[in-house]
Every structure is written in C-alpha cells, then in structure tokens.
Amino acid sequence: MKKYVLPLLLLGGCLCLSGCKAQRSYEPAPSVAAPSVTALEQPFRQMSGNPDGMALYSACTFSYGGQDWAVESYVPAELMLDGELMLDDSCHFLLRVVSGSQDAAVLLDEQVQLGAPAADVWVDGQEQLHVTLRDVRTACYQVTDYVYRPERHAMVGSTVLDASGINYVGTTQR
C-alpha cells in the first residue's frame, strides 16, 4: 500500500497543476418559436353523427353555459378493435368541439406521423371556456389554446408553444 501513496500524490498534484476541470454537458439552444399573435378562428357548423369512415376514439363530455358539450377525437374505423386504437406509424385524427346545439368546430383534421394529439378542457377565472390542443409528434410539439367566443359562435385559438425540429422522447401520461 505504501508504494502506491507517492505515485497517487504525484498524479493528483499533476492534475491540479494542469487545470483539470469538470466536464460540462452540451445543451443545444432551444428551437421554440415565439407564441403566435395570429388568431385561428374555427366557427361552429351544423354536423351530425360520426365523420365518414371514422370512429369515436375518445371524448370528454362536460357542461358549460347550461348546455352539454363534448370534445371528441376520431380515428379511421378500421384502426379500432374492441374499443382500442391499433396505432400505426401514421394515423388520421379529427378533433372537434361539439356544442349543446350539435354544432361542431373542427380543431384538427389531418394525418399525424408518429403521434397522437389530445385536448384538455378548462374554464378560466372569467368563466371563459378553453380547449387546449396538444399536437405532439416525433419532431414537433405544438400547443394551441382555443377560447369559445359566444358572440361569434366560434373557437378562437392562439399558438402557445410551437417547437419543431425536436426529438420528442415521451410522456408520463397513460
């Protein structure tokens, strides 16, 4: 043991004198766009039943302004098996808000590559209805907050977060 003490002390002294520093991890600059100031207006239109060839995947029903409402998510009917989505690399999603009068405003209607969009419903302190759309894909993370405007009978949205060119890793959500 004594024969190793001197070499270890010399090695430690050399490292101190040479300016050995702790390594730092690389943190790339975020590629997040500034929130949008442009309003996205989605008017309510008369719609009844499921869209052609689509099946209801999930829904959030709630009451607002004395009426029953729902946020509905649809996928191609052939991808549903016993109420479960057989998700492939690419899937067509349709998300819409249905008001008490059966009018609907479509928030998303597109093919999604490696992802599954979702929506959250909430009411703020001024009693305004919000539907927050989370469109998460492998290389994209976009959050759009839609607010119901009764005077226009429309959902008016603004982009809260728009990150593209990212590498989405995962979530704790089930």
Describe the predicted segments one by one.
Residues 1-4:
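Positively charged n-region of N-terminal signal peptides that target proteins for export
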Residues 8-10:
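Small-residue packing motifs within transmembrane alpha-helices
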Residues 16-19:
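C-terminal motif of bacterial Sec signal peptides marking the signal peptidase cleavage site
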Residues 21-174:
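Exposed acidic/polar residues on beta-strands and adjacent loops within beta-sheet cores, strongest
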